[in-house]
From Swiss-Prot:
Belongs to the ABC transporter superfamily. Methionine importer (TC 3.A.1.24) family. It is found in: Cell membrane. This is Methionine import ATP-binding protein MetN. It comes from Carboxydothermus hydrogenoformans (strain ATCC BAA-161 / DSM 6008 / Z-2901). Residues 4-240 form the ABC transporter domain. It is an enzyme of class 7 (translocase).
Amino acid sequence: MIIIKNLEITYPGKRKVKAVDNVSLEIKKGEIFGIIGLSGAGKSSLLRAINGLVRPTSGEVWVDGVEITRLSSKELLNLRQKIGMIFQHFNLLDSRTVFGNVAFPLEIGGYPREQIKKRVMEVLELVGLLDKAESYPRELSGGQKQRVGIARAIAANPKILLCDEPTSALDPQTTGQILKLLAEINQKLGITIVIITHEMRVITEICDRVAVMDNGRVVEEGVVTDVFLNPWHPITKEFVNTVISKELPEEVLAHARTRRPDREVLLLRFAGNTANEPVVSRIIKETGVELSILYGNIGHLKDVPYGILAVEIFGDENRRDKVRQILHELSVKLEVV
């Protein structure tokens, strides 16, 4: 659906700024793809290159089979009809009602009046604002304003929805509601969603895959569970530690440092179906080792369960080798602490 090849974006001036530095990505049709990074990482520039709002210095951007950097202004306008966009600060027209805001892109597109009315009411029902059709933005909460922004963005049936920090101005409860709505829209309409954010919650709750940006570059990319359960880049580890703490408490580390030949402290990481397996009981039953749980952390990445467990095992070397064999069979990753 979206292919980015060797993209570079440099802003001219007395001191040139390279906002995007040799980025290549492929975003699949129908997925929710997250791009996370700190302020100034290049996320917004990359997002704006996808709909042609920013012309790259070099590289290619393919959208739905079309290389958009070569398009004329008229061709680019036609392409943008396939792309909806929602913003951090809503960007609603204060002089228009909710209905009028959602109708605006359809009016510009020359849709017949009856078709506009029908479509606006459809999307307002989808976002849960049918009863607010005649209200003005000043009468709405932040979450309701963002729902209007989402309705406006999908009114013309786009294939792609670009989301620029859509929850950063919202409280935690409203953030959860907006994320749930975006996931529902993705499932019901099959729209490909690209969402940039600096909030880990956005990535862990709704994204299928993620790219981590730092200083204009993509430093890690992949399935959310793979990237965030096994991060290697320092910036990724910083983000992960805000929601998935893999830093063991000092008392556990101190305990692990008191070495004995008949015991080991292991850090186990597992995800998916393995997270629901009786791993500990199987180890004890099949190996005869004594096992103590020192630390644990469980949760979900989107709809995938994960677990992190620090355990201490007591037994001879042969039994401990059998423990490792079982963990390998179950695809549980282990690290000796």
